[in-house]
Amino acid sequence: MLSFIQYTLGIMSSLGNGNNQHNINSNTGSSQNSAAEGTMERGSCILVRYASQNSLDESSQKQLPRSNGKEKTTGAYRNNIHTQRSFEAMNMMREQNLLCDVVLVAEGIEIPAHKMVLASCSPYFYAMFTGFEESRQDRITLQGVDPRALQLLIEYVYRAVVEVTEDNVQILLTAANLLQLTDVRDACCDYLQTQLDPSNCLGIRDFADIHGCIDLLNYAETYIEQHFSEVVQFDEFLNLTSDQVAHLIKSDRLSVPTEEKVYECVITWIQYDVNGRQHHLAELMEHVRLPLLSQDYLVQYVEKEQLMKGDLQCKDYIIEALKYHLLKGEQKTCFKTPRTIPRQPVGLPKVLLVIGGQAPKAIRSVECYDLREEKWYQVAEMPTRRCRAGLAVLGDKVYAVGGFNGSLRVKTVDVYDPVLDQWTTSHNMEARRSTLGVAVLNNCIYAVGGFDGSTGLSSAEMFDPKRQEWRLIASMSTRRSSVGVGVVNGLLYAVGGYDGASRQCLASVERYNPSTDTWTQIAEMSARRSGAGVGVLDNILYAVGGHDGPLVRKSVEAYDPATNTWRAVGDMAFCRRNAGVVAHNGMLYVVGGDDGLSNLASVEVYSPESDSWRILPSSMSIGRSYAGVAMIDKPLUSEQQGARVATKQSYASHHPTGTIYSRYANCAALQQAQNEAAAGQAAGFGNDDENSQAEGLNPEPANSNNSAPNGNNVHYENIYESIEQFAPLNGGNGGNGGAHAGIPAGSNPLQYAVLNQPQPGPSGLGPGQAHRSLGGERGAVGGGGGGGGAVGGGCIPPPPPSMLHSMQQLYHPMAYRNELYDRTAGYDVPRGRPAPSYYQNQPPTGPSANGRCPNLHLDLNRVRYPSGASAQQQQRTPRQRSFDDTESYHYYRCQNQSNGTAKYDNLYERVREEPAYQNTGSFAPAANRAAGLFGRFDVIGHGVGRIERHLSSSCGNIDHYSLGGHYAVLGHSHLGTMGHIRLNQSNSSSASSASPYGANGPATTSQPNPTKDSSSVNVKSFLSCLGGENSQSMNNLNKSSAAHGTASGSAPAANGNEATLPGSISGGASGGGAGGAGSSGGNGGQGSSIMGGLASAAAVGVNGTGASTSTTLGGKSTGAIPKISRKSKQSQQQGPSDPTAGTSAPQSLAGGNGLPPVDVSLGAPADPMYANGCGGRVTKPSLQWLLVNKWLPLWVGQTPPDYKFIDFNFMFSRNCDGCSSAGGSHGQQQQQPQELVRYGTIDQADYIPPAREYPTMTGSYPRVLRNTPQLARLREHEYENVPLNDPPPGRGLRGIASPLQVGRARSESPSRPPGSDPLRTWAFDFENNTFRPARSPALATSSGLAINREKPREVRRITDGTFGARDLAQPDTEKPGPSGLASKLALLKQPEPDKEDGRLSSASSSSDSDNFAIESLAAESSGGQPDEEEEEEGGSTRSGVGRRDDGGRVVGNSTEKENVGSSSNETSDSLNYDGPASADRSLSEDEVEAARPDNTASE
């Protein structure tokens, strides 16, 4: 066999002779023969190879150019990737086991390698292969090395890449340290530094100490000292040795709020193993600085500790501490021991604190940026909204001075304590100031310039913390609003700003000398800057950004006091004005601001050494302009301080017995709430949320497992507010008690709930008898009920007894807080089994211990229906799914209904994919699934501020509304409660008797209705498609007229008689429907109700012959929704009606007066158009009108306990595919059990399967709640109020749930006390979201009589979950086309009646923001001078009327100038309000604010 060299020799010699292919082949053979014979020498081979290759290279170079275009190199040649290619080739050979000369073995795993490669990268292998016995071995076994780590390290040697993960970091660091691969070891140490947390830092420190990782060891020790309070809560601390504990607690650098934490951790460590550790107590207490404890703590806790009493040395330490407290003043300084020296932590991490600002409205939220961890987190909110304030850090407190709260310029001062994570108030300034400058000089706070709401200020004042007072100092020479201030060398500088007198942005700068109390002019900046940020680095003053009218700057100037000159430095990445600036560690941080178009959430950092800017990797959660910025020490346990402090305060003030009842929800854990619920009730501590006490007191604990059952318990959810549970105070019911046990007449409504006793029901109430002790006069019980008895509709709790008012202040909101108003509150989030989980709050172990409250987001998906016997069953009750079963179905898998538990997620639970929208219930074992609940839907909505996002219903059906905490059902229920609100394509001429509505009141004659009638109310639109009954919705909509109803049920058990319930909608409906249904074998009585101006068709009793009729009370306010209906020519004869004054309803059931003929036996209207479900669409202005004028008053009380206002919650059905099939023409011939209607069954021939079905965790398929043929046949209303004992066919839940569970699922609709519409006489307070009584202007009617009726109000769409109303004569809709400034000015005038139809002129906008924005220009129309703050930013001037172009900007009639001004909510920029700026002046923030369409800040 030829060798490789011989084979190559023959080829090269043939190529060198230059012969053809034939000769080459022959020569090759001869060469091989020659080589074989040994006739050719080695030297000639080399020569031949060289000659042949040289000839090839020369010929190819002459004919072909260089393909890569590189220049020919001369001299030394260097290939930068040669080493990389070489190692890649060697790694490939290693993987193929080529030329490997050593095999490394670890735990039986063999890894081939090359000695030369290993020795070149590792000193360990270099020594092994050069001077030891292993150099002559080809198989080496490594002891104590993990084979996975060895494989990774060998690959790193060849590839220079290794991935460090949580799984391999420990073995990798150990092996790298042994093999002396220091770079890999350092990479592992860096990774461990990033993974440090209080639960593992002690172990990582020991690990670093063992392996000699000095940097990691020091870093871990610093971390432990800075997070000592958190570290001692974990098991690693309890497993330390006594020497390790002593080494830790003797450090002077421990960061602890008080020495109590050190003392408590020592006691805890001893108690972990008392017998084995008690003898270490004295040596550990030597390092505890007991003299630094408070005297009360020493006496109450330390001296009484049994461990301390049993040790003589510890007693000496206590005596020493008490002596220290007896010393006076300077005597303490002479008493020097190691235990009297305070700890001095160093190197505390810094956080960037951002307070308030505009986003786009004035907000309360406060964010912190951790510079080390590079992440943002929320801390306690300010007490009130605040922007344009000044911020100062004095001592360890942060002062927010002055500013703007959304309506007023304020002079108040709020103080933030980072340690306690709470806000307090301080002394007010002498003057109101917004856009002021604030700085700290000589331990005093200076407030300079600003704007007081009418003029710019040149005055300044100083706050002396020793005297706790503000006093005026010398005034500046120029008025300056939006001024920046800074302190250099003990002097205060006021930089730029805006002068309202000259209406110019300023370039001038003044300097204040506190020793002489004088201001001096210094060199001006090179550019005019208003709203510039000012910071100081190394005695250099920096002016950052700002604007000159509409021109927003990104340039920066620096002032050197030594030379009195300004110079330009590097520009920022973005144009910014009104940004916060703070200096830290030689860097300048610029936070937020706006670029003239939108608010900015980014943060830029300036380095003076490189004269460059960089952007922080993490941005704020929202863009903020006019925010206050400060750099402070990182608060200890920032997320938990609020809970800890609140726990201590509550502990001291509320429960001397030792049980902690916190005023903050994030202090109470689930277990704590369960264990203390009974004790809290017995002590008189309830659970009502202090932020939303809208419906009276509630002593029923939210988390109690042993609460007394209450059949009529109304449970409701509200995303943004707390859950209001008034269950123990609702009305009783007729019948024999059962699961719906009521409270005996004349008894204290709180007696049984507070004492946690069962609630006995009244014995043997007669048929249809009202339970007057609680609900008899507030909501009528359906008359004519048979033996079963009908549940009273409309029961609400009575006013709380006077004795409970004192208890109200001590109520304990265990789980639910108002996220809008209290972001410091945490929320229990029970998830899975067992109840304690990561997201759940952990209770503190003592009055000074820290509870773990890591979850600060809202999750109301918790225990509401505790129905099981075990705690596991009571952790979670399933949430039922809404109509849109195709949405998020697979994501939240459902349990099969047939197994006893239905886990349905809500319609919009995945809107934002937050826990508050998710069904996170645990899946109970099969044996416990019978505890599942099947009742009403849990409706989660989004609040008024988000209404526009749900107006996408294809048929305009409104499904469910949770109004102010009460659960109201309106529209398409698919559960038999009622039909949806119907919109007719055309109206017949027979419906022309509806009262037209003019500008001054109801008209006396009918007028033709124009084609585009956007506000007429058709009575037929509100008749239910399910049997013509809409009592449930009308009961919710018209409580004001139904509140004064009384019950008069007198039907016998056999055949019910008519029950007349004046003014009560629910009673009348229940009288004919539910009352008849309640009879057992008898015939239901006939009920009637006066429905406040709204007629209802007859409803048939399910098991009887009675019917419910309704008459009208003309002129009463109803719940009618104004709609846009497509009119036919015949319908133009019908006069329009008043959306606010109600309609005149027909008096007959024969089809006249606007009602179609009704078949009483079937309970369905005979109008084929109506029966077929031809519908239009509920317009946004109409829905807006309904919210403000109808639903809002129903849930706003008229007594002081009800002042608190709760957000609306609602949602819409996106697709109602059963509207046409659910028409009244189907009648009620076929009765189906409710379970078949809701879920269907496999054996039902007409069951329509869902569009998508997914198996549950048990492998079965759930029955999705979906429109089925059975739903179309269900005609009765008020399903929730049917009798429980012996229900009629089609209404029971046989085989699905127990009566108790059904009772808990009921959704009562409480009535209101008699009285006028609160919204007509009350005004909305924007600051605290409450209603206050207000005067109503007198408006003349057509007859000349004055009536008190306020102008229509409008809900404004905002993003913070609140809403306001303005007293504007706002039309229901806007005309098509762009809305201009002129049209908005016209809104300030009283609208003229439409001569054509006698109604108010209306306009409609296609944009949601226009529909829900308050169109107010009161400030500009007043004729006064514009605000100076707003003038400076280039808003609309009085030189011309602006208009809004296609892009949303406002431009002038003759002049257009693009405004790149502020995007704040009080300024024009949040709506891109770009008005024309005059050439001689610019607009300030507050002047633009007065001219904004949605201005709510005018004073």
From Swiss-Prot:
State where the protein is found.
Answer: Cytoplasm, Cytoskeleton
InterPro entries for this protein: BACK, BTB/POZ_dom, Kelch-typ_b-propeller, Kelch_1, SKP1/BTB/POZ_sf
What GO molecular function annotations does the UniProt record carry, in alphabetical order?
actin binding
Looking up SMART domains in the UniProt record yields: BACK, BTB, Kelch
GO cellular component labels: cytoplasm; cytoskeleton
Where are the residues of the annotated region Disordered?
A: 56-75, 679-714, 750-786, 825-856, 984-1017, 1033-1085, 1107-1160, 1301-1321, 1334-1499
Spell out the Basic and acidic residues composition-biased ranges. 1348-1359
Pfam name, any one: BTB
Question: What ranges does the record list as Gly residues composition bias?
Answer: 776-786, 1065-1085
- Protein name as annotated: Ring canal kelch homolog
